């Protein structure tokens, strides 16, 4: 942190679409990305007082070797075969992948920015997905507002709590 502070620097954290929501067959992957983003949000709040910016980069699909040579898998379980087939079809039919150099150009623009955002989505598909997930969450929260608010009551803290 002191080295970053003296330069009024920034930290760029790679994340992924997996941090936007939990998707079938990606639970452990998504959990790691949720953790990375929570840690990065906390770091951003801590580092802001020192003039240090933190950005979480959330890329969509890019033509890399991730899904061919870059991924280790285990023997599929028969019970998951229909779900796996459905997901493979979705990826084949609707996957929007792009050239990695376009992501690199966006990250360079980010690095050169005087006011980088906490989060940067890379790609149209992930941009749309992020908004869809956010709208769904907002609608759910709004639908359960009364129940949510009823679960809290202003009262004095029990003995032993607080200062």
PLM features: what roles do these ranges have?
Residues 21, 42-53:
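Active-site-adjacent segment of SDR/Rossmann-fold oxidoreductases
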Residues 21-27:
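Active-site loop immediately N-terminal to the catalytic Tyr-X3-Lys motif
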Residues 92, 119-129:
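Short-chain dehydrogenase/reductase
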Residues 92, 139-163:
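Non-catalytic terminal and boundary segments that flank Rossmann-like NAD(P)-dependent oxidoreductase
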Residues 1-9, 45:
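Amphipathic alpha-helical dimer-interface segment in Rossmann-like NAD(P)H-dependent oxidoreductases
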Residues 32:
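Active-site helix of classical SDR
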Residues 49-117:
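SDR active-site lid
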Residues 16:
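Residue(s) in the substrate-gating loop at a strand-loop-helix junction
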């Amino acid at each position: 942190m002191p080295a970053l502070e003296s330069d009024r620097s920034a930290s760029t954290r790679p994340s992924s679409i997996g941090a936007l929501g939990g998707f079938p067959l990606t639970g452990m992957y998504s959990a790691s990305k949720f953790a990375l983003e929570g840690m990065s949000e906390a770091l951003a709040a801590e580092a802001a007082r020192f003039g240090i910016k933190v950005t979480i980069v959330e890329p969509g699909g890019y033509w890399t070797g991730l899904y061919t040579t870059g991924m280790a898998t285990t023997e599929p379980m028969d019970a998951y075969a229909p779900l796996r087939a459905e997901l493979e079809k979705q990826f084949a039919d609707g996957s929007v992948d792009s050239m990695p150099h376009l992501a690199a150009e966006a990250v360079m623009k980010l690095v050169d920015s005087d006011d980088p955002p906490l989060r940067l989505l890379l790609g149209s598909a992930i941009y749309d997905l992020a908004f869809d997930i956010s709208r769904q969450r907002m609608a759910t929260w709004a639908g359960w507002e009364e129940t949510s608010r009823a679960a809290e009551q202003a009262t004095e803290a029990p003995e032993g709590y607080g200062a």
